[in-house]
Amino acid sequence: MKLKSRYTSLISVVSIFFSSMVMAESDIVISVDEGVSIAQPIAVVPFKVNGGVSEDVGQVVADDLRNSGKFTPIQRAKLPSHPASVAEINSQQWTDIGVDVVVVGQITPANNGYNVAYQLVDTLSNPAVVLVQGSFNVPATQMRQAAHTVSDQIFEKLTQIRGAFRTKIAYVVQRGVSAYELRVADYDGFNAFTVVKSKEPLMSPEWSPNGSKLAYVTFENKRPQIVVHDLRSGQRSVVAALKGHNGAPAFSPDGSRLAFASNQDGELNIYIANINGGTPIKLTANVGNNTEPSWSPDGSIIYFTSDRAGSPQVYRMSSSGNDVIPIGTRGSYNAKASSDGKNLIMIAGDNVVKQDLTSGSTEVLSSTFLDESPSISPNGIMIIYSSTKGTSKVLQLVSADGRFKANLPGAEGQFKFPAWSPYLTK
């Protein structure tokens, strides 16, 4: 049986490999579809600015916290006052509107750039108490990165979960029938850069565990091959070029191997290749079509899609190809394990679904159309995926608890195959 066609489907490090790429416009911008109704209220006061700063740092912080699905930032029009430090906060003002935590900050010129200082304040105490604070110097061009740093620190303080707002996404943009670009951007679509352009299809980008490389499928030699692209040097190496189709690359957690699918023997099967060369090893044994491999966090398990029982379904096997058992429901595919190994994110019934690997229970997270290619943030809090909107493919964002949903509409073209980076900073 033929699977659906969709199946074929750091700060210093970041600055190093970005400097060698072609810059693109910020072509995707988050637009809220469904807000959060039961998340924790938080107030992010506009940062007091001394000197000309074009970026609204406070708004970026508020957007980050909202995008996680854990917090509901209070609308600016409803803020009772605009303090810039804990000394200016009247706790009663904030508790009267149901806000227990407030973010305040200041931006001042410093060392040919700016100093960004913030405080996260507990207003349940009177006088208010600082929960966490920070201050750092950044060049003007890194103001959004500074805002994401503030968001990461606040998020971790309030949730005990590491923030992932300084991570990146990779995705493919198709314009027309013969113009493809592989791009990398901030998780929220800003600061997009083109990694490679091609007149032939580009598909299925996948980050290496340390964020320094991307594996992806290219048809540049008139047949599908899997290459590993070093984002620092720009060098590319072919890892899989078996006869027929080669697709769906997935790095092992240690970055030394790549699982992928190939139909060199007629049907699609899962293979593992060493990224430094050598003969790929076949893991599945010509039982139906097998594709879309992904690894468990410890590297001991590979999840994949197979139609061996008559229709697509997610299976698991050991990384040596043994102990194959079905996991997902009939019609499930595109499975990815969360960073803690407790959940699988997959597509089922054309929507993004979360499955608890202990209980087997499932939860539908998305309500969009023809969803595919889900990818999870490294802290497991957010999921990016592709869906169909009218005649276009667009990127969508949903929190892992399903509370927050947003779309990242592209300026022009079809946006496909999103892949969330690992952490890129210490």
Curated annotation (Swiss-Prot):
Gene3D superfamilies: TolB, C-terminal domain (2.120.10.30), TolB, N-terminal domain (3.40.50.10070). It is found in: Periplasm. Residues 1-24 form the signal peptide. Disulfide bonds: none annotated. The keyword Signal applies. Its main location: periplasm. Keywords: Cell cycle, Cell division, Periplasm, Signal. GO terms for biological process: cell division; protein import. InterPro entries: 6-blade_b-propeller_TolB-like, PD40, Tol-Pal_TolB, TolB_N. One of its GO terms (cellular component) is periplasmic space. The Tol-Pal system is composed of five core proteins: the inner membrane proteins TolA, TolQ and TolR, the periplasmic protein TolB and the outer membrane protein Pal. They form a network linking the inner and outer membranes and the peptidoglycan layer. Part of the Tol-Pal system, which plays a role in outer membrane invagination during cell division and is important for maintaining outer membrane integrity. HAMAP family: TolB. Belongs to the TolB family. PANTHER family: PROTEIN TOLB, PROTEIN TOLB HOMOLOG. This is Tol-Pal system protein TolB. It comes from Haemophilus ducreyi (strain 35000HP / ATCC 700724).
